[in-house]
Amino acid sequence: MNNQKSKELFQEAQKYLVGGVNSPVRAFKAVEADPIFIKKGKGCRIWDVDDNEYIDYVLSWGPLILGHAHDQVINAIKQISNYGTSFGAPTELEVEMAKAVIDAVKSVEMVRFVNSGTEATMSAIRLARGYTKRKKIIKFDGCYHGHGDSLLVSAGSGVATLGIPGTPGIPEELASLTIVLPYNNIEAVEEAFEKYGDDIACVIIEPVAGNMGVVAPSKEYHQKLREITRKYGALLIFDEVMTGFRLSYGGAQELYDIEPDLTTFGKVIGGGLPVGAYGGKGEIMEYVAPVGPVYQAGTLSGNPLAMAAGLTQLQLLKQLNPYQELNEKGRFLEEGFKKISQETGVPVVVNRVGSMITVFFTDKEVVDFATAKTSDTKKFAKFFRCMLEKGIYLPASQFEAFFLSTAHSQRDLEDTLNKAYECFKQLS
């Protein structure tokens, strides 16, 4: 496969963009490769600047559940752009989009649109602190909630200890307000609340983890979280930036029948444009300005292009109800990867929830970040490079999810598994 133009562009990009990219994972460092530069996409396929064609399982990291350049989504963007791109003022589209989100997600009574998932989680944390008048928050090791300072925090030594900065630039004093616990460990949550319960504002969690690779919650885990947070008067925040409108129309909370106090959204609700949102019970959301004292604002929040794309995608998802189809596609890939593993003798653990999948190169059950990290990242990197060479575009990290869309056909899935078999044979 010829990647000459991509290589040249990457060399040029590094002169002007930090690391040559605008988000670290795009640099392909974790898979020991140079990034490919994409020029177009359609359906489940993308093409790079060297005209190489790929079946895409990244889908812009999840938003494109209907595939690239869906005709109706593109037409909605084109049509609304004729009237302007941003007004910094209320529009009818914002109201319609809010109604669509509230109609879909039972726990959401009011919503506020922002420009990214990071903004959504930062704002939800601020709101939780303002509403409860408490300082500490709980997050889970391996769950990513954007790059806000309170959330980019690593676990301290031992269970229920205060967090430490996950990157230079975050003050230790701020990091210490975040308690980082192991995912799927309800005893650790109970211990943290026994120790700090009166000062814990909220628990924020990916209801299905996607940023350590796909890790499903253990049975009754969310129900226990709901009970504990209610007992201590803390808010439960579901970060559904990845899972919202992907695992079901009502998100992971519909799948697991749990109502959090606040929910954050992103990805799918923007149809591929920059959008985030946070919403929840009216009495909590009314603490947000201009009604309440918790300040949050944004120049481009609710901009008409993003609202048009997002609303069209949500309307299509409601109409098509593709979730059973997506789940069946996911199951086909899951079973295919497991069969390939058995036939080639390359040990993997395949975790899947709906249309989100991760193939972990380990022989240990993956239930949290510690077990995810038993994966052989060097072996994954070889697998990634082999698949890329064969025209299959996967996430450039062992610890990310593969995403499926309605545009992936049975033939695409079979082609992917055939090529995966060839790559596994090279690894065995």
UniProtKB/Swiss-Prot annotation:
GO CC terms in record: cytoplasm
EC number of this enzyme: 5.4.3.8
Name used for this protein in its record: Glutamate-1-semialdehyde 2,1-aminomutase
Encoding gene, per UniProt annotation: hemL
This protein's pathway: Porphyrin-containing compound metabolism; protoporphyrin-IX biosynthesis; 5-aminolevulinate from L-glutamyl-tRNA(Glu): step 2/2
Keywords associated with the record: Cytoplasm, Isomerase, Porphyrin biosynthesis, Pyridoxal phosphate
UniProt source species: Sulfurihydrogenibium sp. (strain YO3AOP1)
GO molecular function, one term: pyridoxal phosphate binding
GO biological process, one term: protoporphyrinogen IX biosynthetic process
Cofactor: pyridoxal 5'-phosphate
Residues modified to N6-(pyridoxal phosphate)lysine: K267
Pfam (any one): Aminotran_3
Class of the enzyme per the UniProt entry, highest EC level: isomerase
HAMAP family, A to Z: HemL_aminotrans_3
Catalytic activity: (S)-4-amino-5-oxopentanoate = 5-aminolevulinate
Subcellular location: Cytoplasm
Subunit structure: Homodimer.
Family: Belongs to the class-III pyridoxal-phosphate-dependent aminotransferase family. HemL subfamily.
